[in-house]
Amino acid sequence: MIAQCTVDYLGRLTAHLPSARRLLLFKADGSVSVHADDRAYKPLNWMSPPCWLTEDVAGASPAWVVENKAGEQLRITVEEVEHDSCHDLGVDPGLVKDGVEAHLQTLLAEQVQLLGEGYTLVRCEYMTAIGPVDLLCRDEQGGSVAVEIKRRGEIDGVEQLTRYLALLNRNSVLAPVRGVFAAQHIKPQARTLATDRGIRCVTLDYDKMRGMDSDEYRLF
């Protein structure tokens, strides 16, 4: 939707976006994001799933109130709608991993003890409604752990793992599910975001992992 609107965030802090033309995205996973023309792919404000949208018609202009389970709210007051359309994009196949990233996943599945003593592999490419989790593991106490593997660990990867964790933790068989963000190099901003969300970061030494004993790449 493209609309003239104001946006207010109410939660751990407050933020206000004055009236302007903006792009509003309401995705099938429940997320809502507010975009302008000058920030590339980054939204001005957003609410990640799980969250719920209700309409408030009590004021002079209709407003959508998006609230997450923590009680934080994104209030979008619509003054004028310029464009409104709905599209079903279907199931996305996801990113195709490059050679190094795919190899990292294979190696870590074989050397899952690098994540911690007592870790065991449950499944590679554990499928969810929003895409496959790279590795689903059990820790030394039998708890579920979702692992996202990247060559370069950036904020997008942390956001991706956050979405997986939100979905997996709705599964009473798996919950509680913790997250591990594993990469060759993890940017400071991504590490800070992961830590803030309770996700553990693990730096992978690709060269060392390739030098370890691997059933797939053993010649004899």
From Swiss-Prot:
Compartmental location: Cytoplasm
Keyword match DNA repair: no
MF terms (GO), sorted A to Z: DNA binding; single-stranded DNA endodeoxyribonuclease activity
One Pfam family it belongs to: NucS_C
Domain of life: Bacteria
InterPro entries in alphabetical order: Endonuclease_NucS, NucS_C, NucS_N, NucS_N_sf, tRNA_endonuc-like_dom_sf
Its EC number(s): 3.1.-.-
One term under GO cellular component: cytoplasm
UniProt keywords, alphabetically: Cytoplasm, DNA-binding, Endonuclease, Hydrolase, Nuclease
Function recorded in the entry: Cleaves both 3' and 5' ssDNA extremities of branched DNA structures.
Similarity section: Belongs to the NucS endonuclease family.
PANTHER family per the UniProt record, alphabetical: ENDONUCLEASE NUCS (PTHR38814:SF1)
Protein name (record): Endonuclease NucS
